[in-house]
Regions:
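Residue-level detector of beta-strand face positions
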Residues: 7, 30, 219, 402-403, ...
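Extended, highly charged accessory segments
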Residues: 1-12, 19, 24, 52-375
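Short beta-alpha junction loops
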Residues: 58, 426-427, 440
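Short secondary-structure junctions
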Residues: 41, 60-65, 251-260, 387-403
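Metal-dependent nuclease catalytic cores in nucleic-acid-processing enzymes
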Residues: 8, 439-440
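Active-site metal-binding core of divalent-cation-utilizing nuclease and nuclease-like domains
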Residues: 379-430, 434-436
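Short peripheral tails and domain-boundary helices/loops at the edges of structured domains
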Residues: 23-51
């Protein structure tokens, strides 16, 4: 709400945040991991941690792009000329701002107080209670503004940041406007700023806004179903879990926040997808642990309630609908609605609940074995499509055999007289002609 350039409306006036009080602000350089959620102040990085991420060992940890400046602040200032601030409520002049936001979550293994896994080797699923997790809520700048594309926690996005004067905190929009790029009036300073008459940009500080807080949390592994793990599967399952919480505990869960988290798999290559539920009350209320401590049956009951509600929803009588606001569309993150569907939610829940459900206690769900070499449903579909090409359109016979390739599960594919190795999620580097280590 208090980000630079955001607008406030009251008493038929519109004012825009154009300054941060630097007396009540602090900025510090952090290094971000491109693959996992880990971040660390530059000054706190030890010598042996400079080349690879201390958490996931990512080789991109030391890239210059992973070093960014974060700013925490307590007060902003909005100044607008009287005439320019006046608006007419009869006209819809409200123009909302959208920002590149990302929540990074870190916790120690010892913080996992209780963890359960489903005793189905072919269906990896489980959940755990985390007594203390550290959250970093970061605003990387306005959407659609130009800036560098940076990968953080497996998400590659344009992150323009905010440019401000490092002394007076005035917002500098000059860099984002081609029309006034050379105009002297483009520089913005407070009247008493020592850089007011500066002819260069030495006073510019490019920052990302952040806040840190700690709370208790619950983490649920998204099931690796027969359909794989795709955005529709993830978002539909989040919607089902949120619905299950509401049905099980009523309106007493309004302070809980639901989000998606994906991390690199430290057991095998690929990524793991989780639903993260955290208490919006800093420090936590003890509510999550109270709800699901001691037994996994509460989670089972929650899943059953969600399944029964969705399958009995009246929208099943309307073939053109794949969900409604009485079932999965109650999901709060409206920007993900396109990926939420009744059929996807039912497919996941049905696989979890079919046959007898047995639970087993584990140290953490991070240890649950999954076939993470197939990092997405798209990769699985690609392999399935290869098999279906046999003897079609003049192609020779195609045979695929599961095999261990370079120490992990892969495939040998025979196409006529030719034979190829398929190694999922292979790391490419200089030996393969790739300058920056990455996975295709």
């Amino acid at each position: 709400e208090f980000a630079p350039n955001n607008r406030f409306y009251a008493n038929q006036r519109r004012v825009e945040v154009d300054q941060i009080n630097m007396d009540l602000a602090k900025y510090i350089s952090y290094r971000f991991c491109s693959e996992c959620h880990y971040l660390q102040p530059i000054d706190a990085i030890h010598q042996d941690e400079k080349l690879n991420c201390p958490k996931c060992r990512s080789a991109q940890w030391n890239d210059s792009a992973q070093k960014q400046t974060l700013l925490s602040f307590s007060q902003v200032i909005a100044t607008t000329e009287d005439a320019a601030s006046r608006i007419d409520d009869s006209a819809d002049e409200r123009d909302p701002k959208f920002y590149v936001r990302q929540m990074l979550v870190n916790f120690e293994r010892e913080a996992v107080r209780e963890a359960w896994k489903l005793k189905k080797e072919d269906l990896p699923f489980g959940f755990e209670f985390i007594s203390k997790a550290d959250f970093s809520d970061i605003n990387f700048g306005e959407v659609n503004r130009p800036g560098p594309e940076i990968s953080i926690a497996g998400s590659s996005r344009v992150r323009p940041g905010f440019r401000i004067c490092k002394q007076c905190g005035k917002v500098q929009n000059r860099y984002f406007s081609q029309d006034d790029i050379n105009a002297e009036s483009s520089w913005e300073h407070a009247i008493d700023c020592t850089y007011r008459d500066s002819n260069d940009d030495s006073f510019i500080l490019n920052v990302h806004l952040y806040r840190h807080f700690s709370s208790e949390a619950m983490r649920i592994l998204v099931p690796y179903t027969k359909s794989g793990v795709s955005d529709p599967v993830i978002q539909s399952f989040i919607a089902a879990i949120q619905l299950g919480f509401k049905l099980k505990f009523g309106g007493r869960v309004d302070h809980l926040r639901f989000s998606e988290q994906n991390t690199p798999d430290l057991i095998a290559d690929g990524r793991r997808h989780y639903i993260l539920i955290h208490d919006s009350v800093p420090g936590g209320t003890g509510y999550l642990h109270q709800l699901l401590s001691g037994t996994a049956e509460t989670m089972l009951d929650l899943l059953k309630k969600a399944y029964n509600h969705i399958i009995d929803c009246p929208c099943k009588e309307e073939p053109e609908k794949d969900g409604c606001y009485r079932c999965v569309y109650q999901y709060r993150l409206s920007r993900q609605m396109d990926n939420v569907s009744r059929s996807s939610a039912l497919e996941v829940l049905k696989e979890l609940l079919e046959n007898d459900v047995e639970w087993e206690k584990v140290e953490t769900i991070s240890d649950i074995q999954i076939n993470a070499h197939l990092d997405s449903a798209l990769e699985q579909m690609f392999l399935n499509s290869l098999k279906k090409l046999t003897r079609k359109n003049g192609l020779p016979s195609i045979r695929m055999i599961q095999e261990i390739i370079n120490g992990k599960t892969g495939y040998i594919i025979e196409i006529g007289d030719q034979c190829y190795n398929i190694e999922p999620q292979k790391m490419l580097g200089e030996d393969e002609g790739v300058s920056i280590k990455s996975k295709p």
